[in-house]
Amino acid sequence: MKYLLFSDIHGCLPALEKVLDFFEQEKCDMMCIMGDIINYGPRNRIPEGIDPKGIVERLNALADKIVAVRGNCDAEVDQMLLDFPIMETYALLVDNGKCYLLTHGHVYNKENMPKGPYDCIIYGHSHLWELSHNEEGQGIVNTGSITFPKGGNVPTFATLENGKFT
């Protein structure tokens, strides 16, 4: 399976459309969204192209291909609009004998990794892309942000296929 991994949409439909175009062109099987889907949040500027209703419509059309977790800007009212679950702090993805912990990053991240039998933590929240390992050999993947990248980065996301990240 080929997974598209991203986070921090923050209600920006043009950013989501670019990612969904990639999803289709690269023939990804599933997408994992690490939170902050509809709301731009009180600390961010209002994104150009904000369209919460458009975000909901586009993602609901792909609901059977989405695994998502709750970000710090996601609310219970958002769940009422979405046809896929988003309210959990984390989810486990098992593929090719490896276990991946999917989370937003505001609770669990590389500085606060929960104990558990997983091979890699995948998160967003900081809007800073990262691909590394900790001292225990667990993978650390921060998908950055497709809407508000920080650190001079361009919008970022990742793919996972056969245990390899790109």
Predicted regions and their residues:
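Amphipathic repeat-derived elements
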Residues: 1-13, 28-32, 140, 151-166
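Core catalytic region of metal-dependent phosphoesterases/phosphodiesterases
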Residues: 2-95
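Conserved beta-sheet core of the metallophosphoesterase superfamily
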Residues: 88, 99-101, 106-166
